[in-house]
């Protein structure tokens, strides 16, 4: 029996990364249910749309749908409306056209979709390339499918999903796979100011990709920079358990009561 993969992304349904991994999965005899945004929804994180109704459109008979919402909307509607009671074996988000490392994970719609899948207790993984500059998605999809197959054999811990970044180098030059921790920082942050013909001010938030040379050992940055596939386990539970103990020892609650 074919394994069922739920596929989404944040770059939109026409993204080359989405098409490449979809085709690769079908070639590998997976049943692929694709539910993707109808446009680029990068940077939407884990947001759901509550302020307007959403529309699902079937664009191919072969289980291919688009939604006029965020990646998390696609997962939410795909699982509850399209698949209903049929649970997929795995949820894949990507392949993202650019990295999702370090602080990117807080803003990424690609990562947000994988997190949404995890909330539904579905093994989930977010795939991204190490650079947006001319990625070879055919090579990247080959590497991604190896991880997909491993996920169907080895179980993830409950409440955990994977954030995977694959270097944009020829597949034969990739040095291997590393389990990594999340780094810090991702872009040379900048805000660009524009003036309209009527002299109104506008601002563009963005930044240049900047894999820093001074990366800490063991991070997603370092792995990708050194030619390895970075595999970072991310938990749903964001609680800082060490901080609870520290604040308790510092009598933080007692101090609040005293004031």
From Swiss-Prot:
- The main enzyme category here is hydrolase
What does the record give as EC number? 3.1.3.5
Q: How is the cofactor bound?
A: Binds 1 divalent metal cation per subunit.
- Keyword annotations from UniProtKB, A to Z: Cytoplasm, Hydrolase, Metal-binding, Nucleotide-binding
Q: Which residues bind a divalent metal cation?
A: 10-11, 42, 96
Cofactor list: a divalent metal cation
Q: Which GO molecular function annotation, any one, does this entry have?
A: 5'-nucleotidase activity
Q: Which NCBIfam families is this protein grouped with?
A: PRK00346.1-4, surE
Recorded protein name is 5'-nucleotidase SurE
Species this chain originates from: Sulfurihydrogenibium sp. (strain YO3AOP1)
Lineage of the species this protein comes from? Bacteria, Pseudomonadati, Aquificota, Aquificia, Aquificales
